[in-house]
Amino acid sequence: MSIHTDDFGQGGFAQGGFPPDKAPDKLRMISAAPVSRGEEAMERALRPKLLQEYVGQAKAREQLEIFIGAARKRNEALDHVLLFGPPGLGKTTLSHIIAAELGVNLRQTSGPVLEKPKDLAALLTNLEANDVLFIDEIHRLSPVVEEILYPALEDYQIDIMIGEGPAARSIKLDLQPFTLVGATTRAGMLTNPLRDRFGIVARLEFYTAEELARIVRRSAGLLNAPIDDEGAFEIARRSRGTPRIANRLLRRVRDYADVRGDGSITRELADRALAMLDVDPQGFDIMDRKLLEAVVHRFDGGPVGLDNIAASIGEEAGTIEDVIEPYLIQQGFLQRTPRGRMATQAAYRHLGLPVPGDDAS
C-alpha cells in the first residue's frame, strides 16, 4: 500500500499550509485542529493502522468491519464512504485504516485544493483498481469540480474537454473502480446530490473519558512515557472527548514530567501540568470561559446570536461553531435554540454564579 498527498501548490492553503480559519495563531492547546505540520507528523506516528487497534466509535467500526470484509471477499471496490463529525475525532485516521484493511493505495487531498476540474481529473485517472481517494473538507469542493465528480462516483467515468474555443470537444474517460472517502465537519453544507452518492455514512461521536484513557495509555507506550492509570484518566477527562487533544496534552504533560518530575506521569503531576496549561478539570480553557462569561454577563444568559458572541470575544464565528461550541453543548453548558445561544444552569454553576430563578431554593 502506498499513500500520496496531493498539494497542487502550497498545501492548497495560505502560507503555512493551513486554511485561513485555522491559522496557528488562532489555535489553542485544546483546539481539535492540528497546530503545525510537526504535530501532524507526530499524529501519524501515533495513529492506529488497523481497525483492531482503533479505540472508540464502536458503531462506525463495526459497520466498516462488515463492509470492508464484504468488499475484500468479492474483490470489489468498497462503496463510497462519508465520515462526518467534529474535528479531531479520527476521520483521517479511518481513511488510512480503510485503505490498509483493503490492501490498496490511498490518495489524499482536500476540498479547497481541488480548484479546477483538471485537478480532480489528474487524481482520478491515476487511481489503480479499488484504490481509496480521501478528500478532507469535502464540503468545500467548488460546484464545477463537484459536477465532474458525480459521473466518476456513479459510473467510474469522467468527461473532460479537449482543445479550446470552437474546436473544443468533450471526451469520456473510463476510470478504474475506486472508493471515495469524504470527510467533513459540516455535513449540512454538502449538496444533496453529493450526499446521496455515498453508500456508507458514518457519524463520529465524541469519545468517553474511558476510551480516551485507553488512547492515552497506548500513545504513552509509543512515546516511551511511563504513565499510570490515574494519570492517563486525568489527561483523558480534560481532553474534550477528542483524541487529537488527548495526544497533544499527553505530549505537553510528558515534557512537564521530564523537567519538573522524574519522567513518570501520575494523576498529581498531570494535574499540575494541566493547571499550568490553563486547562481546568472540565477541559475548558480561557476561550471556553470567555464564551460562557460573555453569554452570561454581556447578554444576560441569552438567547444571543453567533455573530454577536464572535464579536464579543474576538473570535471567528466558524471557529466558535466548529471548535468551541460542540463540546460546551455536548457537556450541557450551552444550548442552541431557534433564537440563539443560551447559557444553562451548569454554566452559571461552573462560573460560580447564582442560577437565575433559584432564589426561592
Curated annotation (Swiss-Prot):
Using the UniProt annotation, give all residue ranges assigned to the region (Small ATPAse domain (RuvB-S)).
208-278
Residue segments, region Disordered: 1-25
Enumerate the subcellular locations listed in this protein's record, separating them with semicolons: Cytoplasm
Q: Which SUPFAM superfamilies match?
A: P-loop containing nucleoside triphosphate hydrolases, Winged helix' DNA-binding domain
Pfam families named in the record: AAA_lid_4 (PF17864), RuvB_C (PF05491), RuvB_N (PF05496)
Q: Which residues bind ATP?
A: 46-47, 88, 91-93, 154-156, 197, 207, 244
Q: Which GO terms describe its molecular function?
A: ATP binding; ATP hydrolysis activity; four-way junction DNA binding; four-way junction helicase activity
Gene Ontology CC annotation, any one: Holliday junction resolvase complex
| Catalytic activity of the protein | ATP + H2O = ADP + phosphate + H(+)
Entry-linked InterPro entries? AAA+_ATPase, AAA_lid_4, DNA_helicase_Holl-junc_RuvB, P-loop_NTPase, RuvB-like_N, RuvB_C, WH-like_DNA-bd_sf, WH_DNA-bd_sf
- The first-level EC class reads hydrolase
According to its UniProt entry, the function of this protein is described as: The RuvA-RuvB-RuvC complex processes Holliday junction (HJ) DNA during genetic recombination and DNA repair, while the RuvA-RuvB complex plays an important role in the rescue of blocked DNA replication forks via replication fork reversal (RFR). RuvA specifically binds to HJ cruciform DNA, conferring on it an open structure. The RuvB hexamer acts as an ATP-dependent pump, pulling dsDNA into and through the RuvAB complex. RuvB forms 2 homohexamers on either side of HJ DNA bound by 1 or 2 RuvA tetramers; 4 subunits per hexamer contact DNA at a time.
Which PANTHER family does UniProt cross-reference here? Answer: HOLLIDAY JUNCTION BRANCH MIGRATION COMPLEX SUBUNIT RUVB, PTHR42848
Free-text note on domains in this protein's UniProt record: Has 3 domains, the large (RuvB-L) and small ATPase (RuvB-S) domains and the C-terminal head (RuvB-H) domain. The head domain binds DNA, while the ATPase domains jointly bind ATP, ADP or are empty depending on the state of the subunit in the translocation cycle. During a single DNA translocation step the structure of each domain remains the same, but their relative positions change.
Q: What is this protein called?
A: Holliday junction branch migration complex subunit RuvB
Organism of derivation = Delftia acidovorans (strain DSM 14801 / SPH-1)
